[in-house]
Amino acid sequence: MNLSAFRVAGGIIAEEMSSSLRVLFVPVSGPSGMGEFARARSLADALKARWPDVETHFVLHREAPYARNFHHPATLVPASPTLCTAEVKRVIAQFAPQVVIFDNAGRTGALRAARRTGARVIYVSSRGRQRYKAFRLRWMRLLDEHWISYPAMIAGGATLLERLKLRLLGRPTLRFLDTVLAPADEPAAQTLIADFGMPDVLIVPGGGSQFHDSAMTPAHFARWGEAIAAHGYKVAFVAGPAYAESAHTSDRFCVLREVRGGALRVLLERSRIVLVNGGDTLLQALALGKACVAVPIAGDQPARVTRCAELGAVRAPAPQADAVLQECLDLLEDEGSRLALEEKVRAVGFADALPTLLDRIGELAAEASRATAVDQRS
């Protein structure tokens, strides 16, 4: 994509680019979990929608179930990219991106390799350990942007020490992201839902695998969905790529597979309530103003769900069949309760960070291209 300008918030950054816009995504990946991958996929899809000729590339664990039949170019590595620094460095050298986005993945050597090629470097953290890593001085000197993948009211604002470090170095730019919503894909959603129609309840338990630090599984969500359907409501269960268990489908309960972010957004928007885990999809649903019943499914999620409940933004029942079922039925049967919960969600003010992030990626790519052009002339 030979661009003469990037359109960004605040005007046009004029920038002659001698080569295509190239963005490399390095999300943590593996046989279980997919939140980081899903966020990176949404960003990549949105970049392609805004700049159709953009070149994207991913580095993914070859055993990740979503790595099969992925619609963006990808290099598959034998473990999570954090453990494959040599392979990541090789991809950086060959692909020569203007922007590299590490999402909870990467080691110092990979970040340095990106800087050496002239790329701008973004790091996304969603857990305390990764946030701590990104606030080490040697990493702060390598990063242009540090995105914390939850709002400050949930993740906690910058601490005194973090603020002092930012003031000392003057970098990186720190951003708290409420969530990243993929552009809506109405045709894909309609294809998925076919003759079933839009559901009363959308169930999204995550990537489909069980986490080692939790007894809760996606199968529990499927059983709850079947129970809700038995009360006469239409329920759609989004089976993540690692979900292999069978479910008893009917004219009231359907299982959806290979649901991309744009289709998921439409399904979230059209459902009456959402039964969801405590990961990224919860924040996506809240940004859309949906009434949610949230049940954590991994060790980092209980605190997040509890905080959302404290804000009055979700229903957070005990993870027991009767309690979860009753909360869902209450919201379905009592429209006043559902509307009141939606009003509280809107009052909290969760927002989609995607437009701002796309603008920033465009700005960083322009900066990288300008710096490369200067180096080539000198």
Task: Please annotate each region the language model reported.
Residues 321, 327-346, 367-371:
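Conserved donor-nucleotide binding/catalytic region of nucleotide-linked donor-dependent transferases
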Residues 142-207, 240-242:
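A nucleotide-sugar donor-handling region in carbohydrate enzymes
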Residues 191-270:
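Donor-nucleotide binding loops and adjacent catalytic segments primarily
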Residues 350-378:
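C-terminal alpha-helical cap of glycosyltransferases
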Residues 76-80, 256-258, 315-320:
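Short acidic-hydrophobic, aromatic-tinged amphipathic segments that line or gate anion-handling sites
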Residues 24-50, 57-164:
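Active-site and donor-binding regions of nucleotide-sugar-utilizing enzymes
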Residues 102-103, 263-304:
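A donor-sugar binding/catalytic signature common to diverse glycosyltransferases
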